[in-house]
Structure formats: structure tokens, C-alpha cells
Amino acid sequence: MGIFDYKNLGTEGSKTLFADAMAITLYSYHNLDNGFAVGYQHNGLGLGLPATLVGALLGSTDSQGVIPGIPWNPDSEKAALEAVQKAGWTPISASALGYAGKVDARGTFFGEKAGYTTAQVEVLGKYDDAGKLLEIGIGFRGTSGPRETLISDSIGDLISDLLAALGPKDYAKNYAGEAFGGLLKNVADYAGAHGLTGKDVVVSGHSLGGLAVNSMADLSNYKWAGFYKDANYVAYASPTQSAGDKVLNIGYENDPVFRALDGSSFNLSSLGVHDKPHESTTDNIVSFNDHYASTLWNVLPFSIVNLPTWVSHLPTAYGDGMTRILESGFYDQMTRDSTVIVANLSDPARANTWVQDLNRNAEPHKGNTFIIGSDGNDLIQGGNGADFIEGGKGNDTIRDNSGHNTFLFSGHFGNDRVIGYQPTDKLVFKDVQGSTDLRDHAKVVGADTVLTFGADSVTLVGVGHGGLWTEGVVIG
């Protein structure tokens, strides 16, 4: 059972659901964090932090910040629409739904009741080649707003965040019904008129949007005539968790918002480390970013009120890092509670920072550890146990500490180096160029053994004649 497997969909069905849910979630933000994401990747959180923050606000020639109308910025709104359409989804208009509530020029729907008017949601459809509606996607936006009204909308959403934690009983549970009760009825009617059932609906969202996903799941049995009781619910970075198994709650262990509430209850741990496992949550996925890696940043306590920790919360980091888990060759071996370290370092930090399990601000990690590299040139270090390491693309350097690791190299993986390889390790080559006979690929070069697959290679540093066991190499 894979780490993101959902209900009885099986692995491939669950992967498709995850990809759809992520595409819808990212679209709901309209690329709002594009400037920060690009600035962070180029400049990091160290000496380049000022440039990262400038990029977040003003963008650059290759990104759009949160301030609209900067002439040298690309149109990230257009890019967001193109991305969700490429994933197979198209926004459904208010007129098609017969809905008379507030909607903006982009087709985003706004909350209906007083106190919820800054909530936002997207409604999308997936169609076959003949134009027949196959599925409906509902994407709740997290705390933020369109660039033009970002400050006022964010303040309204922050009030909702506080009320969910500290306000009236069941505020979080009832949130989706209060904010979008009328719209969701129209969507249910529209779906039914096109021959769809709740099973054909994907509900997704991030942060406050993830809270809305859990809320809608909680309400689904008795609201909207029960239409959504069998819908598919995937929430990212939600502070709350719905009771039961309707929702798959996905998040980074070091995201201060994810699981901040116990169910929907606030307690003292909500303000600090909150790593309690829940039935519906992924509990041990780490975003190995500049903040997590830095001893200096971690002098300050881990807390939802410590703003630097929020780098682990941004939607772009979810889209990139979580998708690499989904596409990993180790996916089938990962369970809901596996320890998974995802490389999300900036370019400056990646050059001299070893990606590894620091087990920071969390309960002790147990069992095998999976480390997933990026498309850049990563430095990856295994621990003392049995690790599963996939460097990804780029020219990676991998340090082996235990001698009981499995290294996976897939497709065009670059020119990698393994330091400390031992015969008890396992090398797995998947979808690589050439034959499946190790003798066609292995050659001793000086004091090293080099395995070459077309333009890609792995150098086993310090491993000469007799140091490589054929039993420990799989080529497929």
C-alpha cells in the first residue's frame, strides 16, 4: 500500500487522485507564491534572504510576486490556468452552475455569509474528448486572496483561522457549509444533471482550504442531501483532521500549520511542536529546506508564530516535493507513516548541505528512512539504519553510513557518486540505457568502479576489483 493510497482506489487510482487534487489545489492559489518560490530557489534563506523577500513582493523577469502590475513580471495567473488545463481540468462558470453569488473575473467563488466573505473556492470540470463531463473538482483556497485584495482578504481569513482554533464550538466543522452552502448545492445539482454522483467529485485544498476539505467531509452525510458523502477528499497542510477515513490529510512534519489542532481542538502543543500521529494523516514527511537544515534558524523555537518556519507551508513546495514522492520508484514501499525526507533546498544551500534525517522538532523516527533528492546536484547522506535513497536527476553525491542501503537510479539520472559503498548495499537501476548484464556497464577506473548507462553513470568511490557484488546490483 503506497503512502498516498486512498480508500479502495488502489495504487494507480490513488496516484491519479493525488495528481488531480494537487493540480486543483495549486490552481486555487493562482500562483500567488510564485515570486517567493523562484526567489527562494535562486537565493535561499541565508545571505540571499533579502533578495528572496524582494522576489516575493516584486517578482522578477521569470516570476510574479504578490504585488500586481509589475511590468517585467510574467503572467503567473495565465500560467496557473494553463497548468490546471494541462492536468485535464477546466473552470466551470457561475452561469453554467446557475449561481448568483459573488464571483470575480477569474471565475473564483467567494464566501456567502457575513464573516466568511473572504473565503474562496474554485469549481472545475474534467471532460472526455467529446466534451462529456466526467468529474468535478472543488478547490478551496488557503489563507490569502487575489493579488488585488491580498491584505484585506488575508485578514478576513486569519480571523477564520483564529475562530477555528479558539472560537465557537464546531466552527471548523461547519466552515464549508457556512461559507459555501449555497454554491455546493448548485454544484451537486449540476453534477446530478450531468449523470454524476458524489464518487465523481474531487475535493481538495491547502491550509485553511484543507480545513474546508475536512469540514465538507464532516458535513457530507447530512448536508446537500448527502450528495457528497462518497466524494474523494484530499487535504494538504490542514490544521484540522476530520473523524473517520473520508479525508486523506497530507502534510510536512515540519509545517507549523499541518496538524496544529488535535482534530479541531486547540491545546498548548498547537503553538509549538505538534507531531501527534492521526489516522488520516501522513506523519513523518520532512521538507528538507534551508530552515530545517540550519542550526542558526533552529535556535528559535519551532512554532506557528515563528514566521521562518512557514517556508515549509508554501503551496509550491507541496506541489514539487510531494509530487516527487508520488513519482518515486520507492512509492509502493512507503506507508502512511514512513519517514520520508524530501530535498527542498535552495541552490546556494544545496551546494554544501547534506540532505539527511535530522529528526528535528518531532517524535523519534522509527523504521526505514526514504530520502528523495531533487532535480539538482544534491548531497545526500544516509543514516545508521536501512535507508532507501533516490537521488533523482542531477549529479548527486551520496554518502553511505550503514552498508544496508538501497540506492535507486532511474532513467536519465545524471552522473552520481557513492561514497562508502559496501557489498551489503543494493544498487537498483530502472529504465536505464543498455543491457541488463552488469558486465556491460561496470569498469574499474583507478581506485573506483564506474557503472555507465549511456550518458549517465554511478561512480563507487574507492571500490576497486572485487568490491562490487553482482548479487547486490539489479538492472531492469
From Swiss-Prot:
> What does the record give under GO molecular function?
calcium ion binding; triacylglycerol lipase activity
InterPro entries, sorted: AB_hydrolase_fold, Hemolysin-typ_Ca-bd_CS, Hemolysn_Ca-bd, Serralysin-like_metalloprot_C
- Calcium recorded as keyword: yes
Query: To which protein family does this belong?
Result: Belongs to the AB hydrolase superfamily. Lipase family.
Q: Where does each Hemolysin-type calcium-binding repeat begin and end? A: 372-389, 390-407, 410-427
Q: By its UniProt entry, which PROSITE patterns does this protein fall under?
A: HEMOLYSIN_CALCIUM, LIPASE_SER
The alphabetized list of GO BP terms reads: lipid catabolic process
Record field: catalytic activity: a triacylglycerol + H2O = a diacylglycerol + a fatty acid + H(+)
Catalytic residues, chain numbering: 207
The record lists the organism as Pseudomonas fluorescens
Leader sequence residues: 1-23
Q: What is this protein called?
A: Lipase
UniProt KW Cytoplasm keyword: no
Source organism's superkingdom?
Answer: Bacteria
Q: Detail which positions bind Ca(2+).
A: 437, 440, 448
Q: Which Pfam families match?
A: HemolysinCabind
UniProt keyword terms in alphabetical order: Calcium, Hydrolase, Lipid degradation, Lipid metabolism, Metal-binding, Repeat, Signal
- What EC number(s) is this enzyme filed under? 3.1.1.3
